[in-house]
Amino acid sequence: SDEEIGSNTSRALIEQEALKSQVVLVPEPAAPHTGALKTARKGVGKFSIQIKGKAAHAGQDHQDGISAIQEMAHQILFLHSLTDYELDTTLNVGVVRGGSGLNVVAEQAELNVDLRISQFGEGERV
């Protein structure tokens, strides 16, 4: 299959090839807690989002700053709201970075996102 270069699914190809075979080896490990066999995998998207604000001294010029971290907090809440357990779609912000010092309104922030989908349309929705 062309899984590594971006196929939407290789299930049809696997089923077609399986009809010609007596034995099939699947090198995918079983579920860790139950030992259940894998019959499908979620699609994966990994994203890095950069946010730019405006630095300012937190004590003297706070009002002149635009906090990239504050904006990042809003974005994280929004991104997590896209999770839909009924559609088996999960979105996780797993890594965040930002700021340059305790007394500086953060000029930059970055977050890393992991998206998992089971249905093709979910990629478009998210």
Locations of regions flagged by a protein language model:
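Metal-dependent amide/peptide-bond hydrolase catalytic core
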Residues: P29-T34, T39, G45-V126
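Acidic/histidine-rich catalytic neighborhood of metal-dependent amide-processing enzymes
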Residues: S1-A40
